[in-house]
Structures are given as structure tokens and as C-alpha cells.
Amino acid sequence: MAAAKRSRAALTIYNVASRAGVSIASVSRVLNGQGTPRADTRERVMRAVEELGFVPDGAARALSNNVKEVVGVVFRRGAETPFADEDESLLFIDVINRGIEVAAQRRGFDVLISSVGVHDESVFTRVAAIAGKVDGLILHDRMLSPAEITRLASVVPIASLAGTPTRASMSVGCDNETGIRELVRHLVIDHGYRSLGYLAGHADSPDNRARASAFEAEASAAGAEIHMGAAWQGNYSASGGAEVITSLLDSGARLPRAIVCANDQTALGVMHALARRRVAVPGQVAVTGFDDVPVARHLHPPLTTVRQPIQKMGATAFEVLYSRISAGSRTRSVVLPVELIIRESCGCAHQPEALPNSTLAATGRA
């Protein structure tokens, strides 16, 4: 194993160029995403990178004992949509990144944030290039295979958020199962809803799979009619949620009495689409989310959801990564608790907050 690592550490961009039969400049353009190299050139470079197990800049950094005091954060960027101005990076991911940044600053670290496109063909190469510039990586969602994570983890420590757990990396997440089960029980037991739908997130997301599995198990145990599957496949975005509902209504499908969305952004799109078709929420269809992003409480009606400690997740991801960088800690996974947040979109009555006497006096209502 040590010999294999030394062999990999000796690799340079020159080896890739030689293996691919292209110039060093061409390899640099492909690896750095610069210019528009020809498709065959890109393919040859990527094949050489794969065959050699090359990690850009990483080996030289791994051989050095110098800590750069920089961690890299990579998230998956959604495709352009009609809701482009509310890309998920502005909601859930932004809050997580804020937690990472605050925790990093306390330790004297800087944060290098980057994104990869959902349909990018060179995700590993892009992430590997970032790995060569930092002391550790935090990856949002599932963007690399277990084999790719293992390869990168030989160069820098890796913590994944809602990603694929591997023996080579650390993971930080929330208790998806408990959150969804409590939500389903609330809808079935407290409201008496007998038909429930699950509008999914990314099909390859471990979080989505955990939530879908918990939903199906709890709804089945309650004897509820279940709506899920291909027709209910979203992508964690408002546009994805809106498109699913619009498609179902256009096809003449009967909507369930309550729709459990994989995240709050999906719920935002669902509520938007239902409002456009004059379907009352929660009077005709109840809608719930997952995350409790800041905007959730300001929707109309306010969104019932499962709150996960989003900013704490980011801070925790940095701390487990920092512990590995600074002290070689072997923490493998951290699961944070969640909380059911009941508002009005599920059908619960609005509970007005009591105003302090000083406020009542100022409004003439005391």
C-alpha cells in the first residue's frame, strides 16, 4: 500500500499529458475547466486521469507537513430553471455553508467554496483539483462514488453532508427516519388523512432514500393510501416540485389529501403550483416540508416541516474535519436530532403569539 501511495505521489501533469498524448496546456485546460477543449481531447485526458489515479496537486501537498488552514466546500449546482433566482444554494446550502464558515473562522481557517453542475462529466476531476489546494474537504450531497471518495481520502480528509458514508470518510447528517415518521403520524393520527404522497428529492441522495423509506414504512403501517414513485420524482428544487404537481394535475390524476415533500424548497414549488390551479392549502391538500429553512415560516400558509439544525450541521462537519486534520481523530459519523415544527400548511389552526403588554399599550389594545 505504501508503495502504491508513493507511486501515485510521483505523478504529475506531465504523466497525464504523456498518457493522453496531448500537450500539457491541453491537460491544464481540461483539469481547470478553462476554455473549450475538443471533446476527444477532454475524453483522452479524463481517461488518463482515471487510469493513472491522478489527483491534481494533491500528492505534492500530501507529502508536505505544512497546513494551509483552508478547507474546501463543494456543493452540487442545479440546472438552470424558471426558479433560478432561488437556487438551493440560496437556502439550505447557504445556511450550512454559514455554519462551516463560522466554525472555521473560530479555528483560524479560511473556506474555499465551489460548485459542480448536476450534469457535469468531470465532477471527480473538479473536486480533485480543489483537494490539492486545501487541508480537507466537505462535500454536500452525493457527488462522488464511494471509490472516488476513497481515492481522494488518501490525499486529504473528507467529511460528507448527506453523502455516501465510506470507511475512508466522515459523515454528518440528521435523523431523517425519526423526523419523517413523526410527521406521517401527525398527518394520519392528528388530522385523519388517509391518502399521502411523497414528493422525492434527488434519486441518488442518501437523505432522500432514507426519508422515502421511512415515509413508506410509516404510511403503510398506518394503513394509508400511498402516492410515490416515478411520477413523484422531484430534485429538491421549487421548480421540480411545481413541475411534478402541474404534470399530475394536467394528466387528471387525483392528488392525495396530504403531500410530504423531501425538503422545504420542493414544498415551496408545490404550494406555488397548487395556488396557480386554485387548489387550497391546507383545505384541499395539506403540504409539508423538511429542513425548516428561514423562509418556511413566512410562506402562506406557514409551512409545517421537520427542522434539522442546518447551521449546526455545517459547524459539526467542520469540527470533525478539523479534528482529523489537527489530531488524527477517527470519528466516523455524527447524526444530529430533528424536531417536528407544526404550523398551518398541514391543517393545524394558527396559534397567535401573545403580545407583551407594552406592545398592546402602544397599539391601544391594552
Residue ranges and their predicted role:
Residues 51-57, 118-122, 140-141, 243, ...:
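Short gly/ser/thr-rich secondary-structure transition/capping motifs
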Residues 55-125:
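Amphipathic helical "hinge" segments at domain boundaries
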Residues 74, 138-140, 260:
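Structural motif
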Residues 122-178:
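Short beta-strand-centered segments that line the small-molecule binding cleft or hinge
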Residues 1-5, 19, 51, 99-109, ...:
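Bacterial carbohydrate/catabolite-sensing allosteric modules
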Residues 1-70, 350, 359-366:
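N-terminal helix-turn-helix DNA-binding module of bacterial transcription factors
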